Amino acid sequence: MTNSKARYVLEPVQVTGTTFALNGTTLSYQFHVDEPSADLRSDHFGGSISGPIPVDPEPIVDGWTGMPDRVRREFPDQGRGDFRVPAFRIRQAEGHTVSAFRYREHEIVPGKEVSASGLPGVFGDAHDATTLIVRLVDPYSDLAAELKYTVFPKYDTVVRSASITNKSNSDVTIESLASLSVDFPFDELEMIGLRGDWAREAHRLRRKVDYGVQSFGSTTGFSSHLHNPFVALVHPSTTESQGEAWGFSLIYSGSFTINVEKSSQGLTRVSIGPSQLSWTLKPGETFDSPECVAVYSSTGIGGMSRSLHGLYRKHLMKSKFATEDRPVLLNSWEGLYFHIDQDRMYRLAQEAAALGVKLLVMDDGWFGDEHPRTSDDAGLGDWIPNPARFPDGLTPLVNRITALKVANSQRNMRFGIWVEPEMVNPRSTLYQQHPDWVLHAGNYPRTEQRNQLVLNMSLPEVQEFIISAMSEILNAADITYVKWDHNRGLAETPSPCANHAYMLGAYRVFDVLTTRFPNVIWEGCASGGGRFDPGILQYFPQVWTSDDSDAVERIFIQFGTSLAYPASAMGGHISSVPNHQTGRTTPLTFRAHVAMMCGSFGLELDPAHLTDSERRDIPGLIALAEKISPIVVKGDLWRLALPEDSNWPAALFLSENRTQGVLFFFQLAPMVNHSLPRVRLQGLEDGALYRVDGEGPYSGSMLMNLGLQYSFRGDYGSRLAFIERE
């Protein structure tokens, strides 16, 4: 949360006449109904204010007073004089895209339930949240709109969504519908996004908001590696710990668009929502947008991130594992790739158990009968164990593995598998039987990527097949972990609305399976972090953050990902060196410390290739990871120094009650003839006393204002310090 000591005293939702105020700990979000036009006008989104807000004086230019593109609007339309990016575009039966929604009524509802529309969303009871529903009508077209605002005061957060209902007698087409559109009166802002590609996701990009529209998003059918459905607005002077920051995060896993527009008048508009819609809305039907989370922070970018992290852990992620420690795992992929069978997997499990690993994950290569999955060009869709590799099926192997005792533990080994149910290889029995189940556009060639095609998740028969196939696997053996992959984008979509329909079908499958198997740890993956978004976190409590397991690259990726997402949702592994993606060699401890910054910690290697010293050191590193895991999973994060700005990136996790902490401090490259690097902590109490790895006690003021010095030697140094309040 933004300020752990602050207490909100205003009602979360206050209505005075037709002025609406949403209040948080340090947040005010206000808008009103313009009396002449019944249009919703934005007043303020920022720090707490009280009392009336003066109406903005309209600029006076001969003949142009009162033009719609010169005022701040809450639900801006298209075609009636506002030439900025609209919040929606509806093609009417007559062919035009003119709409005129006017305020009709409002309702205040305690709490917030997950949407019944099939989309993921936040939830909370009356103590956590209050929802304002504003209803609008277009008297010329018989269309109705609802804008929903849920305020979570503790997190200085407003969650917005929109819906359109067709009350006319003709079809209309929803060509776009933003989940949120907000106008700021400021003209000197900067925007921060997360850009990247495969194996280099979530790299920060901070740039000036200049005149015109700056737009980014995804057209791949999933949120993608290229851009994340998140953007922050900040003042040029805002830092990690000081200044105002606004964060916008879309609860959606499909194609999306974020527009940041600075108008000729110096107003700044942010709109965010799904893209590639073109959704036909028949009479009596309603179309719902995804939800967008809007966070305000008066304590810098770090405060914004902590609000998002807390909200997502408590009010978005439904899995019980969202706030529980995850077992240390070993994934077979980089150790064995496709070269797996029952003997190799049992040998891997034995060696993992001897190291103290609690969970063995069998990655790709275990399935396919007539088309064995011995490479990536066959087998997807045929979810039965390969009889040549697993002649007795999975159940006996799983029973043998789960009977293994883990060294230095009272627990037995657990077992997990990799799947990619949304895909199919042309070389598979499933495709031969159901070629019509894949996305395709008439007679056009079906584009393969990674030798695979995409199943049409909007089809009920496809959904039922996946639910049945996955349920059969999980019912047949004691499998307690599933890594769910998604390795390509959507192509040859059969209709303009197919991308959104695909996501609705996928969400239904996720919901059914995670509800049916609540004791399974579900991990999302899309060639790494290609679908790391709030929508997926509703169902899967963790995501494989990147296919790049190089520790140096992972520092940038994990620091970037933490801008919007909690460490509890990240997966990080110790892999072998030289690293398989970069060829870089880094020390074991450095690799381990980087991976420990994730809620799911593990190894991705073949233990048979470990050196004697690595074999001796890994059990202690596993024990350390398990010791700090409750703080990383449940605690709050302070990014003390960013890898983009410093040779010594650092981060601090503090427990919820602020009595324990873990400091991560890294050196990327040596610096000759230079004073020892110093790190100043944050989030402590000035007058409290703390011990650092047992030394001290030191005052919180000393640790925050002077800090600690550590010595490093050579490339890729790391320090992990345990902090405890007396």
Swiss-Prot record:
Give the enzyme class.
Answer: hydrolase
Q: Name one GO molecular function term.
A: alpha-galactosidase activity
Q: Which GO terms describe its biological process?
A: polysaccharide catabolic process
Q: What is its EC number?
A: 3.2.1.22
User: What chemistry does it catalyse, as a reaction equation?
Assistant: Hydrolysis of terminal, non-reducing alpha-D-galactose residues in alpha-D-galactosides, including galactose oligosaccharides, galactomannans and galactolipids
Q: Which UniProt keywords apply?
A: Carbohydrate metabolism, Glycoprotein, Glycosidase, Hydrolase, Magnesium, NAD, Polysaccharide degradation, Secreted
Instruction: Provide the residues annotated with a glycan attachment (glycosylation).
Output: N23, N166, N456, N657, N673
**Names of the cofactor(s):** Mg(2+); NAD(+)
- Name where it mostly resides: secreted
GO cellular component: a single term: extracellular region
Q: Where in the cell is it found?
A: Secreted
- Name the protein family: Belongs to the glycosyl hydrolase 36 family.
Q: How does it assemble?
A: Homotetramer.
- Describe the function of this protein: Hydrolyzes a variety of simple alpha-D-galactoside as well as more complex molecules such as oligosaccharides and polysaccharides. Not active on paranitrophenyl-alpha-galactoside and raffinose.
Q: What is this protein called?
A: Probable alpha-galactosidase G
Organism for this UniProt entry: Emericella nidulans (strain FGSC A4 / ATCC 38163 / CBS 112.46 / NRRL 194 / M139) (Aspergillus nidulans)
Q: List the top taxonomic levels of the source.
A: Eukaryota, Fungi, Dikarya, Ascomycota, Pezizomycotina
As recorded in Swiss-Prot or TrEMBL, the protein's gene is named aglG
